[in-house]
Amino acid sequence: MLIKILEEKLMELIQIVGVIFALFALSRVVLQLKRRSISFNEGLFWIFVWGFVVIFLVFPEFFGYVAEVLGVGRGVDALIYISIVVLFYLIYRLYAKINNLERQITHIVREIAIRDRYEPKKRD
């Protein structure tokens, strides 16, 4: 009996801490949007993600419904599957950004090499 009460209180504590953390993360995203440190689309994505976290923490039974719609056994399974898809998307985005940066660096290095080839070297 006491263990059951403690488990319920612990779950509530975990939910409270999680919501506080998610709201803190949301405030950081909004601050970065105001400073224009991130693009509008990136900000919108992270607002969606952290909002989704808040919904999950406040209404954990919501994922039971999502699991039924997706045809998955449990809500936690649906959460894991959705998380994996989101992580693969983020990995793809990082790959695309790194690939773009590599192309830009290659272009800059080639421009510098061509410029240095035809300009006389200055001696100190």
From Swiss-Prot:
GO terms for cellular component: plasma membrane. This is Uncharacterized protein MJ1580. The chain crosses the membrane at residues 13-33, 43-63, 71-91. It is found in: Cell membrane. It is a multi-pass membrane protein. Keywords: Cell membrane, Membrane, Transmembrane, Transmembrane helix. To M.thermoautotrophicum MTH137. Its main location: membrane.
